[in-house]
Amino acid sequence: MPPYRSRTTTHGRNMAGARGLWRATGMKDGDFGKPIIAVANSFTQFVPGHVHLKDLGQLVAREIEAAGGVAKEFNTIAVDDGIAMGHDGMLYSLPSREIIADSVEYMVNAHCADAIVCISNCDKITPGMLMASLRLNIPVVFVSGGPMEAGKVLLGGKTKALDLVDAMVAAADDKVSEADVAAIERSACPTCGSCSGMFTANSMNCLTEALGLALPGNGSMLATHGDRKRLFVEAGHLIVDLARRYYEQDDSSVLPRSIASFAAFENAMTLDISMGGSTNTVLHLLAAAHEGEIDFTMADIDRLSRRVPVLCKVAPAVADVHVEDVHRAGGVMAILGELERAGLIHGDLPVVHAPSLKEALERWDLRRTSSESVTEFFRAAPGGVPTQVAFSQNARWKETDVDRAGGVIRDVEHAFSKDGGLAVLYGNLAEDGAIVKTAGVDASILVFSGPARVFESQDAAVEAILANQIKPGDVLVIRYEGPRGGPGMQEMLYPTSYLKSKGLGKACALITDGRFSGGTSGLSIGHVSPEAAEGGLIGLVEEGDSIQIDIPNRRLHLDISDEALAHRRTAMAEKGKGAWKPAHRTRKVSTALRAYAAMATSAARGAVRDVDQLFH
């Protein structure tokens, strides 16, 4: 039976000093010997998805102590990708994931905590905490802050649902008046919570449910709704139970690596493909699998993408459906229920709240359950009142959406598409793969070819788009924005939003070794690997080169002869120290970012750090 980790610091004469310090934090004689549970919070006033978390750590802590544990809360950082977007602040977003993972590991291991409750929400925080949890492999429960309510605005006599991306697109569209832009800006993000579409934050919070590490509703219950409080209360009790099962009953089935197994990663990726989640989830699942020593790769994602249909389309793939609508239709459990019926996921896997996923679905899938309380839970609706306060409203839909033929969530027979919402492309431009969110690509441009318009930075591409220098049929290539080349692998939400605003969203393609926001749609191909800074072919593309994209056949190809390619490689090598570096780009790169770049790996490996690279 494994000993409680915390007894390293709470037991024995030689730990008198440590016990003295524990007493100074409020511990009493009777607390020594109880499981010490770390509450990893991520409150910050910088991020709407985290602005309401300040008191929620202590809410969980009280429940932990009521269940017989000792709770100790700490905070980690959180970057708002939307605020960091469109300038050099975005260089820090992806590297912050590693810092979050490290900070959780540091705090938990330094103080020998026995288990963790991870209070996350936005883009890099959930992945960072997930990476840490799989590194540490001690009992964990995830509970996120929840999604924001969708915005509503009255334009031209009609009420329109909207989100952050609408504000970006409208601001760049010369045809939209100043008054309408102001109205959209003021209405796009009305409440606390993670942005209301199926962007990266909400995608990842849904995937923690599929991995088995979070409670039902974690990915879809609104941040503002009173019912979300129950998740925090239950998490506090559940984590003490999981800790006791492991340390007192020698039940290793409750550990993260037992729950988030290879098969669970298949379930999570299957969910992601079926709901057209953010392409960033590919990076984050690969990174989490790496930390858990699970051999889950791009090849597995490619395999799954070829057999999983699209059962749910949410903004940005469609304009008028947001995560609050997914919740009304039964949330993640309803999508998993349809996938399980079709034999597309593993139902026999353990989850933190039930012996198996299949047993959980019997209670939580709206089409199976007889529980009135579950139905009531999924009737939780937006309150329609701007607020930064958690659990501040209790609105209800009159009924849930269980229409699986024409509703927000479909069954396999009525799928939006038989092909999945994400695809892995290969070819000479992406020998190790590239990712495209097919759920956001118009059917008319699934096969596309055109001349390359080459840019050495996101900023240069934005400047060209806004100056009307991009024409229908162009293929924008934005390079040296990968994990090492950026460094930090910036998101390209502004270029794709500006293409939309110029009426080019269905007339152009964008290819990059950087990545895309979960808010991106259109023919946007990211994570091109190997990246330009690693000697990838994307670094040799020249203005006017013909590029072919064939999503149905998973192909990304630069039309170039072997002779011409060899000549370009020779010319690049002759640049010496200037080889595989962006020409004419002025960008100040801090020591912190240089350290990340020195260890960063390819997007095909999740852009995780590899310390061994420092010694080659």
Curated annotation (Swiss-Prot):
Keyword field contains Nucleotide-binding: no
Keyword Ribosomal protein belongs to the record: no
Catalytic residues, chain numbering: 517
One example of a Gene Ontology biological process annotation: L-valine biosynthetic process
Annotated cofactor note: Binds 1 [2Fe-2S] cluster per subunit. This cluster acts as a Lewis acid cofactor.
An example Gene Ontology CC term for this record: cytosol
UniProt-annotated binding residues for [2Fe-2S] cluster: 122, 195
Enzyme class, broadest EC rank: lyase
Keywords: 2Fe-2S, Amino-acid biosynthesis, Branched-chain amino acid biosynthesis, Iron, Iron-sulfur, Lyase, Magnesium, Metal-binding
Pathway: Amino-acid biosynthesis; L-isoleucine biosynthesis; L-isoleucine from 2-oxobutanoate: step 3/4; Amino-acid biosynthesis; L-valine biosynthesis; L-valine from pyruvate: step 3/4
Pfam families in the record: ILV_EDD_C, ILVD_EDD_N
Known catalytic reactions: (2R)-2,3-dihydroxy-3-methylbutanoate = 3-methyl-2-oxobutanoate + H2O; (2R,3R)-2,3-dihydroxy-3-methylpentanoate = (S)-3-methyl-2-oxopentanoate + H2O
Subunit structure: Homodimer.
Protein name: Dihydroxy-acid dehydratase
Organism: Methylocella silvestris (strain DSM 15510 / CIP 108128 / LMG 27833 / NCIMB 13906 / BL2)
